[in-house]
Amino acid sequence: MSDSGSFAASRSRREKTEKSGRKEALERLKRAKAGEKVKYEVEQVSSIYEEVDEAEYSKLVRDRQDDDWIVDDDGTGYVEDGREIFDDDLEDNALADSGKGAKGAPKDKTNVKKSSVSKPNNIKSMFMASAVKKTTDKAVDLSKDDLLGDLLQDLKSQAVPITPPPVITLKKKKLAGSPLNPFSVPPTAPKVLPTSVKRLPAVTKPGHPAAQSKASVPRQIKKEPKAELISSAVGPLKVEAQVKEEDSGMVEFDDGDFDEPMEEDVEITPVDSSTIKTQAQSIKCVKEENIKEEKSSFITSATLNESCWDQIDEAEPMTTEIQVDSSHLPLVTGADGSQVFRFYWLDAYEDQYSQPGVVYLFGKVWIESADAYVSCCVSVKNIERTVYLLPRENRVQLSTGKDTGAPVSMMHVYQEFNEAVAEKYKIMKFKSKKVDKDYAFEIPDVPASSEYLEVRYSADSPQLPQDLKGETFSHVFGTNTSSLELFLLSRKIKGPSWLEIKSPQLSSQPMSWCKVEAVVTRPDQVSVVKDLAPPPVVVLSLSMKTVQNAKTHQNEIVAIAALVHHTFPLDKAPPQPPFQTHFCVLSKLNDCIFPYDYNEAVKQKNANIEIALTERTLLGFFLAKIHKIDPDVIVGHDIYGFDLEVLLQRINSCKVPFWSKIGRLRRSVMPKLGGRSGFAERNAACGRIICDIEISAKELIRCKSYHLSELVHQILKAERVVIPPENIRNAYNDSVHLLYMLENTWIDAKFILQIMCELNVLPLALQITNIAGNVMSRTLMGGRSERNEYLLLHAFTENNFIVPDKPVFKKMQQTTVEDNDDMGTDQNKNKSRKKAAYAGGLVLEPKVGFYDKFILLLDFNSLYPSIIQEYNICFTTVHREAPSTQKGEDQDEIPELPHSDLEMGILPREIRKLVERRRHVKQLMKQPDLNPDLYLQYDIRQKALKLTANSMYGCLGFSYSRFYAKPLAALVTHQGREILLHTKEMVQKMNLEVIYGDTDSIMINTNCNNLEEVFKLGNRVKSEINKSYKLLEIDIDGIFKSLLLLKKKKYAALTVEPTGDGKYVTKQELKGLDIVRRDWCELAKQAGNYVISQILSDQPRDSIVENIQKKLTEIGENVTNGTVPITQYEINKALTKDPQDYPDKKSLPHVHVALWINSQGGRKVKAGDTISYVICQDGSNLSASQRAYAQEQLQKQENLSIDTQYYLSQQVHPVVARICEPIDGIDSALIAMWLGLDPSQFRAHRHYQQDEENDALLGGPSQLTDEEKYRDCERFKFFCPKCGTENIYDNVFDGSGLQIEPGLKRCSKPECDASPLDYVIQVHNKLLLDIRRYIKKYYSGWLVCEEKTCQNRTRRLPLSFSRNGPICQACSKATLRSEYPEKALYTQLCFYRFIFDWDYALEKVVSEQERGHLKKKLFQESENQYKKLKSTVDQVLSRSGYSEVNLSKLFQTLNTIK
């Protein structure tokens, strides 16, 4: 190192000059131990700072920067940035690691020497420099250095202090940016801020002496337009050389805090005019490129005619800087004339463990001087724990539980709490008072109304146990109530709203990343302001591309695209376009390089792209943008399941500082990631509302899957191009593909934002949250039970009730998704599924068949909420007894209905409020000339009210709900069943036929073809039923022109929609059929849809059968020929839990494929995701369920091919067969034949045993012809002993007319002259062997599952039975039936008797002419041989008990016992 101006010499050091200091200290310690009093002596400390003026200090800093203080390093290794040693940001631990690289990156300050573009300043470049031969210095043309030019631009910028305070920047319309930097401000006339706007003092961090010492220096604002237009740029303009560098220039974001402005306080010195001229030309060039960008295209994608980049700047705002004075808060005058802090809260956060009793509120505050809203954070402190102690009547000994008989007063309760409880749980200070409270919930021995001891103590003290009891008190309520809940309920805050804070205080230390911060010392200083419109919010739509690292198997982020709208309204229609600005950032993989022509390609396309040469730089840049844009809402797809977790993991892995900028609360310790509940990810983003459109879509619409591609297709009617993860790595091979990949990321962000707008997610969530009174970020996570919980919490708290404590479950139920796709998997473990907790809605037995006359569908409006109102069912009105231990658990205890004279309970009152509010809003929507924005606002509000009201009943029956009340839920459903039965009886009394009913609706067969008459009939029925109720109301829900009713909850119909003038149009409606379920392939669904459309059409029956035959034959041929697209074979099935949690992974195809997807990297599939797979032939003998593959596997592996046999027999055939079941002339075997399958495998017993017995009692079989009766029987076969030809016999006689003769008379081969009757003994033996074979087949006892897709076959009788028979252990969906039932055996034996019954055939089968001919021919010998064969069958049938009815046994119950 050089001696002059060395590092040590240039810095002040705090040094102890006195050498005897240690000795003196020991002497003082010795005297103190001896008892001598020691006085504290204040030493006069000399100043450790050298005081200089601003100009001198700036010159000193520049001298340090210019000094090459490392000897012989040629300026390549280290750089002096001129700062003091205490300017380093010591707050974040990550800096310790980043400092090891000895890079010259700026440390959270703006007085930074910009590093040279020509040589990167990092260790890698130093080693590279040492490895090559040293060359002589070349002359450098400074006029071509745009970074130097940028510094020269700063010469005219405004003067700033050394440690400038943060700048709040709100952007307005800007033109297209420079080729590489979308954040540079183009040369436009600046907006000069008024001089009255004050500058905030610097927000300093603890242990930051330099910042603290200069915090009071205000920023000076000069009206210099030319300086403003240059200095307001976020980063310098970049040139082509930057792409080739590793960590230099603007991509060096190692440790910097990007919210700081990047101006320097420099001394103005003369500048060479040529440099200024060059800079002016550069600006002019940028301006021309901005104009060109509007016309140029980026890259033509598969889905867009022109590149999306051409339209991205249509609504971009101008950039203006807003400066907020943090020396005082932006106060306004309240209603009482006092000065209050008014802000709109959007999100709330609490940390019950590290900061108990503190709630952080995040929102927006209006800055009058800047005419804009900025973010704010309010810390509400000192929220006390509040518990209620219920006194006993008499004192009880806790050890024995005996009643001592001594009465208990409130003073006794206080004394026990003070002496026993407070001391045990270290509650040093508490307040208490006597209060009167009501209770109406499920703890049996709590009185309806009583005096309680209310105790309040600091949240810093421990939480009391929930089951705490004492000698003087029996229960303690409110022990585990969170501070946030206490705050929201006590201050009556219902969702995002305007709040006023009295006596707010400035925050002594920065606690958040918000622009304005305030502290409230008492929660009662917060009050709600009503009837003010919500402010606009900043919305950011996010999309990412990741690649899995082959070594670490971690997802690494390579590209991020984001769209931003700075003034997104929450109470109006979404803006068009839905974004104003955007940014994209692209990184390269560690083992890849950018294409050689990438920089040129970007410049030609004028794309707005930031380049980050490492993932760490990309993440640092992203956090900087998040902080600068400061979004209130971050929108994404599967953002909770993937994006947030990956972002936080990569930020942690790359040791990027200020990770907490992803949210709004400053934190240093990152929460532990990887939990299945996503708890850490949610907390990390606190302060910013996370909107996951996947969760919102699941609540608002029905889709076969909720992948982004499917949502784009269904909602936006567009097609999304998906880039497979392996193609992302390949995209770095050339610029075209790399730019296309980045554009694809941008388009995904646009799709996400458009879907959010299309579904009105934010306004709807806001309305629901305002109704329920919870937190909006929780509403967007889709938890309906929490919404109902908060609505009831507010209602009961306002009515002076003690609310039930949040239940604590020892073993939480595994996260499952409400889906029936995986019914019965691992049933033994989930006992709750075996039997419902109480009886649900009533489903009437359907009258299966096809109806071609008008069917009337009547439906009760909101049945369960209406029942709760009609009968005043509430916690406060229904008397519930304690569950009896003597009664069986299976016995439902239905409580009595409340008396009609009782006052309306809180639950029906709340529902009535919702219903009346919705009715009022719908009336407002009918106003003429209504503003479209207002109409949309009303529509969203009525939807929110409807969603909330309809889900209110659910909290009663949900066992994990805080307001779970099984008796109330059972009473509601019981009344629903009674109402449906009563409705059915009333309709039948009107001489009408009810063909089906389900929970809240009935179907009536009108036997009428006149639509007008049907409506009259419906209105008559409706008025008669509604007379019986005050609030319950039934209405005409629809009219079906034709209906195919298959079974319970499964039907297809043509609904009638009148168009006026007596005309109507029809629309197909499907309920519960296979073709509306997602676990059937598209091929089967299309076949089923076609069959249904044919059946419901007006064509003749023969034409329908013929059309179905043609279609199925065509499908069979197309599948066999391989002309069906692969997408038609995809089967979709949802995961009800995480793939690794399934016990039998191999037997479940979607789980098997899900595990493969997770092993490939990229997005991990989890519970709730829908998996698409195809069944393939892979050369193995495994079952179809184990031959499931993802479509990507099919395309990559040559040995895989579609299993056409499976799709025809297990997908198309079952779907079509079930639909055609009630249709005469079509059966399973016929459908199989049309599809090209073996019909013998599908000769299924279509009718169940119970149906067959009913038919037999009604004489069904006797009405069938012999041909129909024996249609499914196997024919008798006999090989001719002479020629070996197989003869098949199915009747006594062959031929007709004069050619008729016994079937056994001659061999079926014309050339053979042998007669089987000559070998009657052999025929007899063959017949006996066949009979024995069938009897053996019956007694082998094979059982098969009646579900065609299951194909389970077993001889083991399961232990679990249903009403219809033993339940299949394989699928747990259907029952097992005998593969060869007794009726089939009996019918087969009867068939053998039929083909040898000479007398019966002579009398019943042949005509009179043929009968006379047979008698003339004298077949006496043949007749005797036939009778011998028949007698063999008769002997066997005589031993069968199937055809006998034991009358004595049948009527034995009628015998009287003597």
Swiss-Prot record:
Protein name listed in UniProt: DNA polymerase alpha catalytic subunit
InterPro entries reported in the protein's UniProt record: DNA-dir_DNA_pol_B, DNA-dir_DNA_pol_B_CS, DNA-dir_DNA_pol_B_exonuc, DNA-dir_DNA_pol_B_multi_dom, DNA/RNA_pol_sf, DNA_pol_a_cat_su_N, DNA_pol_B_thumb, DNA_pol_palm_dom_sf
Recorded family membership: Belongs to the DNA polymerase type-B family.
Pfam families, alphabetized: DNA_pol_alpha_N, DNA_pol_B, DNA_pol_B_exo1, zf-DNA_Pol
Keyword annotations of the record: DNA replication, DNA-binding, DNA-directed DNA polymerase, Metal-binding, Nucleotidyltransferase, Nucleus, Transferase, Zinc, Zinc-finger
Residues reported in the UniProt entry to bind Zn(2+) 2: C1345, C1350, C1368, C1371
Catalytic activity: DNA(n) + a 2'-deoxyribonucleoside 5'-triphosphate = DNA(n+1) + diphosphate
Subcellular location: Nucleus
